[in-house]
Design a protein with these regions (language model features):
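A short, glycine/acidic-enriched catalytic loop
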Residues: 223
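Cell wall/extracellular polymer interaction/catalysis modules
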Residues: 2-217, 226
Length: 227
């Protein structure tokens, strides 16, 4: 794919961007990207989504689009070329990168199973609650709410587990739009961002996630959704 590099005089027009080939930038979601995913075009056709702060290498500009090589996070997309309309690239990339590189999440059981009413699900759920501490803040989570014999799920086993980068939209199997829409605009952002968990002693996604909601199928599900 031939691309060009705008190295002429600086463009001072409002909303403009000067494309610098070889520059590293990071993805940024717009206010309208409420779920937390930014739609990008794939080289060769089709589209995909990336989350905030994905590391991108600027390849250049062609026909009103800015092209990037994905350098981080989305394992299935690393090394691939994606593009944005030039006017969107103004809003959808930034140079600073993430302020915090990593975080440790410590989860501690808070007693045994209890039945609690969920205002979102409008019914009683049998929950295994825990407290998740992240950056000094304590957040209520549920580790399971669907039990045998009706279901085969169970709480995550104790251990030191790795939190992986978000993989894809989970709207189909676990739409969380209702939680976001229950609060004033802007209270909950990126509700569709799920973080896979690599269990201690295993490799790759265990199909357990850190995500928000009131129903857990063995995930670390953030019950205090507004936090």
């Amino acid at each position: 794919m031939p691309v060009t590099n705008n190295r002429g005089s600086s463009n001072q027009s409002s909303g403009s961007i000067q494309v610098v080939k070889g520059e590293v930038v990071y993805s940024n979601i717009r206010p309208q990207d409420k779920d937390g995913w930014l739609l990008v075009a794939l080289e060769g056709g089709g589209t995909n989504n990336i989350h905030e702060n994905v590391k991108l290498l600027t390849l250049g500009e062609k026909n009103g689009r800015v092209y990037y090589k994905i350098l981080s996070d989305r394992r299935d997309l690393i090394g691939k070329t994606v593009s944005l309309k030039k006017e969107n690239a103004v809003l959808c990339t930034h140079k600073a990168g993430p302020v915090q590189k990593s975080a440790i999440l410590k989860v501690t059981y808070s007693g045994g199973r209890v039945d609690e009413y969920s205002r979102f699900k409008r019914g009683m759920l049998s929950q295994q609650f825990a407290i998740m501490n992240v950056n000094g803040a304590n957040i209520k989570v549920t580790l399971n709410s669907a039990w045998p014999p009706s279901f085969s799920y169970s709480p995550i086993i104790p251990g030191t587990h790795k939190i992986m980068a978000p993989d894809y939209s989970h709207k189909v199997e676990g739409d969380t739009t209702g939680y976001r829409d229950a609060f004033p605009l802007g209270t909950i952002r990126c509700n569709d961002i799920w973080f896979p968990i690599e269990l201690e002693g295993t490799k790759g996604n265990s199909s357990r996630y850190v995500h928000l909601g009131n129903v857990s199928h063995g995930c670390v599900t953030v019950y205090d959704v507004e936090k």
